[in-house]
Structures are given as C-alpha cells and as structure tokens.
Amino acid sequence: MTRSLTKNPFVANRLLRKINNLNTKSEKEIIITWSRTSTIIPAMIGHTIAIHNGKEHLPIYVTDRMVGHKLGEFSPTLNFRGHAKNDNRSRR
C-alpha cells in the first residue's frame, strides 16, 4: 500500500540535514546512509548517496527520474547466483 498523499514523504532527519548542509555550501560529496526507507526528494538530485545493502555501501548517483522512489530500491540486498547444476554423474 502506498503512503497517503496528505502525509509528507519520509526522509530521515539526519540524511535531510546532510543534504541541506551540502546544498547551502553548494558542495558535492558522497553521503553515507543506512536509511533505505527514505524517499528521494528533489533536493537530493545531483548528489551521490552510498546506500547500505547489509554488507557494504553502494554509491548511487541521484537523477530526476528517481524522485519519489525509496533509496533501498537502488541497492539490491540479495545476490542470486543461479540454481544448483543438475550433475547426474556425481550421484552414481
């Protein structure tokens, strides 16, 4: 279920503070965050945000097409390597 339009999008306070500080200084640096549930807002466009996937931080460059999505959508947590091969010779 999607979030109600009467509510504002969720962005972690610490992440929002970092974005606003960089925007006022007009600097670009990698922002490290564990907040995968934060919604991407227009103030984040042009920044590189390193999102935690459970093991490491993946740097993601935010573009205008990502606005409205969650940060966690862009850093996959699972690494599917394929199903096990069916080796009939080893069974005999």
UniProtKB/Swiss-Prot annotation:
Record's keyword terms, sorted: Chloroplast, Plastid, Ribonucleoprotein, Ribosomal protein, RNA-binding, rRNA-binding
GO biological process: ribosomal small subunit assembly; translation
GO cellular component: chloroplast; mitochondrial small ribosomal subunit
Pfam families the UniProt entry points to: Ribosomal_S19
Coiled-coil annotated spans: none
Superkingdom assignment: Eukaryota
SUPFAM superfamilies for this protein: Ribosomal protein S19 (SSF54570)
Statement: the UniProt record of this protein carries the keyword Plastid: yes
PANTHER family: RIBOSOMAL PROTEIN S19P FAMILY MEMBER, SMALL RIBOSOMAL SUBUNIT PROTEIN US19M
Family to which this protein belongs: Belongs to the universal ribosomal protein uS19 family.
Known function: Protein S19 forms a complex with S13 that binds strongly to the 16S ribosomal RNA.
Protein name: Small ribosomal subunit protein uS19c
Biological source species: Lotus japonicus (Lotus corniculatus var. japonicus)
